[in-house]
Regions:
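Conserved class I S-adenosyl-L-methionine
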Residues: 1-32, 34-42, 45-49, 65-68, 124-135
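Class I SAM-dependent methyltransferase core
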Residues: 38, 60, 103
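Class I SAM-dependent methyltransferase SAM/SAH-binding core
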Residues: 43-84
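A short acidic, Gly/Pro-enriched loop at the edge of an enzyme's catalytic core
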Residues: 86-95
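A short SAM/SAH-binding and catalytic strip from SAM-dependent methyltransferases
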Residues: 95-107
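A short glycine-rich, Lys/Arg-flanked "PGG" loop and its adjoining helix->strand segment in the class I
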Residues: 109-124
Length: 135
Protein backbone atom coordinates (compact mmCIF):
# COMPACT_ATOMS: atom_id res chain seq x y z
CA UNK A 1 0.00 0.00 0.00
CA UNK A 2 1.30 3.46 -0.90
CA UNK A 3 2.55 5.47 2.08
CA UNK A 4 0.19 8.40 1.43
CA UNK A 5 -2.82 6.07 1.36
CA UNK A 6 -1.69 4.36 4.57
CA UNK A 7 -1.26 7.76 6.24
CA UNK A 8 -4.76 8.79 5.16
CA UNK A 9 -6.27 5.57 6.52
CA UNK A 10 -4.47 6.14 9.82
CA UNK A 11 -5.75 9.73 9.95
CA UNK A 12 -9.32 8.47 9.57
CA UNK A 13 -8.88 6.44 12.76
CA UNK A 14 -7.80 9.48 14.77
CA UNK A 15 -10.34 11.61 16.67
CA UNK A 16 -9.83 14.57 14.30
CA UNK A 17 -10.42 12.35 11.28
CA UNK A 18 -13.66 11.08 12.76
CA UNK A 19 -14.74 14.59 13.83
CA UNK A 20 -14.14 15.88 10.29
CA UNK A 21 -16.58 13.35 8.82
CA UNK A 22 -19.10 13.81 11.64
CA UNK A 23 -19.19 17.56 10.90
CA UNK A 24 -19.29 17.00 7.14
CA UNK A 25 -22.16 14.50 7.33
CA UNK A 26 -24.09 16.91 9.54
CA UNK A 27 -23.64 19.66 6.94
CA UNK A 28 -24.81 17.35 4.13
CA UNK A 29 -27.77 15.83 6.02
CA UNK A 30 -30.46 17.66 4.03
CA UNK A 31 -29.31 16.29 0.67
CA UNK A 32 -32.01 13.76 -0.20
CA UNK A 33 -33.45 12.50 -3.46
CA UNK A 34 -30.70 14.15 -5.50
CA UNK A 35 -28.30 13.09 -8.23
CA UNK A 36 -24.84 13.58 -6.70
CA UNK A 37 -21.35 13.59 -8.22
CA UNK A 38 -18.53 12.93 -5.75
CA UNK A 39 -15.41 13.97 -7.67
CA UNK A 40 -12.26 12.61 -6.07
CA UNK A 41 -14.23 10.17 -3.95
CA UNK A 42 -11.22 8.54 -2.31
CA UNK A 43 -12.32 5.63 -0.14
CA UNK A 44 -15.98 6.40 -0.86
CA UNK A 45 -16.90 7.50 2.65
CA UNK A 46 -18.99 10.48 1.51
CA UNK A 47 -20.38 8.70 -1.56
CA UNK A 48 -21.44 5.76 0.59
CA UNK A 49 -23.06 8.04 3.18
CA UNK A 50 -25.00 10.05 0.61
CA UNK A 51 -26.03 6.90 -1.30
CA UNK A 52 -28.41 6.09 1.56
CA UNK A 53 -30.90 8.63 0.16
CA UNK A 54 -29.47 9.78 -3.19
CA UNK A 55 -28.31 8.54 -6.56
CA UNK A 56 -24.52 8.90 -6.32
CA UNK A 57 -21.81 8.70 -8.96
CA UNK A 58 -18.27 8.65 -7.56
CA UNK A 59 -15.15 9.40 -9.61
CA UNK A 60 -11.66 8.64 -8.26
CA UNK A 61 -8.38 8.42 -10.21
CA UNK A 62 -6.49 6.28 -7.69
CA UNK A 63 -7.24 2.59 -8.34
CA UNK A 64 -5.78 1.55 -4.99
CA UNK A 65 -8.19 3.83 -3.13
CA UNK A 66 -11.10 2.54 -5.21
CA UNK A 67 -10.13 -1.03 -4.33
CA UNK A 68 -10.30 -0.13 -0.62
CA UNK A 69 -13.52 1.88 -0.85
CA UNK A 70 -16.50 1.69 1.45
CA UNK A 71 -19.74 0.59 -0.18
CA UNK A 72 -22.50 -0.39 2.21
CA UNK A 73 -25.07 1.47 0.08
CA UNK A 74 -25.33 1.24 -3.73
CA UNK A 75 -23.53 3.89 -5.75
CA UNK A 76 -21.73 3.88 -9.09
CA UNK A 77 -17.92 4.10 -8.93
CA UNK A 78 -15.76 5.12 -11.88
CA UNK A 79 -11.97 5.23 -12.06
CA UNK A 80 -10.88 8.43 -13.76
CA UNK A 81 -10.64 12.17 -13.45
CA UNK A 82 -11.42 15.12 -15.72
CA UNK A 83 -11.71 12.71 -18.66
CA UNK A 84 -14.73 11.07 -17.00
CA UNK A 85 -16.48 14.41 -16.54
CA UNK A 86 -16.43 15.06 -20.28
CA UNK A 87 -18.71 12.07 -20.89
CA UNK A 88 -21.62 13.37 -18.78
CA UNK A 89 -24.50 15.44 -20.13
CA UNK A 90 -24.88 19.12 -19.26
CA UNK A 91 -26.89 19.91 -16.12
CA UNK A 92 -26.96 16.28 -15.01
CA UNK A 93 -26.21 16.69 -11.27
CA UNK A 94 -28.08 18.40 -8.44
CA UNK A 95 -25.03 18.29 -6.18
CA UNK A 96 -21.31 18.14 -6.94
CA UNK A 97 -18.79 17.43 -4.19
CA UNK A 98 -15.08 18.09 -4.56
CA UNK A 99 -13.56 17.58 -1.12
CA UNK A 100 -9.81 17.69 -0.52
CA UNK A 101 -9.13 17.21 -4.23
CA UNK A 102 -8.30 20.53 -5.93
CA UNK A 103 -4.84 20.63 -4.36
CA UNK A 104 -3.99 17.52 -6.42
CA UNK A 105 -5.51 18.70 -9.72
CA UNK A 106 -3.22 20.19 -12.37
CA UNK A 107 -5.89 21.95 -14.42
CA UNK A 108 -8.23 23.35 -11.77
CA UNK A 109 -9.83 25.77 -14.19
CA UNK A 110 -10.92 22.94 -16.50
CA UNK A 111 -12.36 20.98 -13.57
CA UNK A 112 -14.32 23.99 -12.31
CA UNK A 113 -15.62 24.69 -15.82
CA UNK A 114 -16.77 21.08 -16.04
CA UNK A 115 -18.57 21.45 -12.69
CA UNK A 116 -20.38 24.54 -13.98
CA UNK A 117 -21.46 22.63 -17.08
CA UNK A 118 -22.59 19.56 -15.15
CA UNK A 119 -24.44 21.31 -12.33
CA UNK A 120 -28.18 21.84 -12.74
CA UNK A 121 -29.45 25.41 -12.36
CA UNK A 122 -29.80 26.10 -8.64
CA UNK A 123 -27.61 23.10 -7.82
CA UNK A 124 -25.11 22.84 -4.98
CA UNK A 125 -21.33 22.80 -5.44
CA UNK A 126 -19.42 21.82 -2.29
CA UNK A 127 -15.65 22.37 -2.36
CA UNK A 128 -13.35 21.66 0.57
CA UNK A 129 -9.69 22.61 0.31
CA UNK A 130 -7.25 22.60 3.22
CA UNK A 131 -5.53 25.80 4.20
CA UNK A 132 -1.86 24.96 3.66
CA UNK A 133 -0.76 27.74 6.01
CA UNK A 134 -2.76 26.18 8.82
CA UNK A 135 -1.26 22.70 8.45
Amino acid sequence: MAANIQAYLENLQQPWGQIYYDILFEQLKDIKGKRVLDFGSGFGLVANHLAQENQVLAVEPNEEMVALRTQDHPYQQLVGSLDQLESFEDASFDVILCHNVLEYVENRKAVLKAFIRLLKPGGLLSIVKPNEVGR
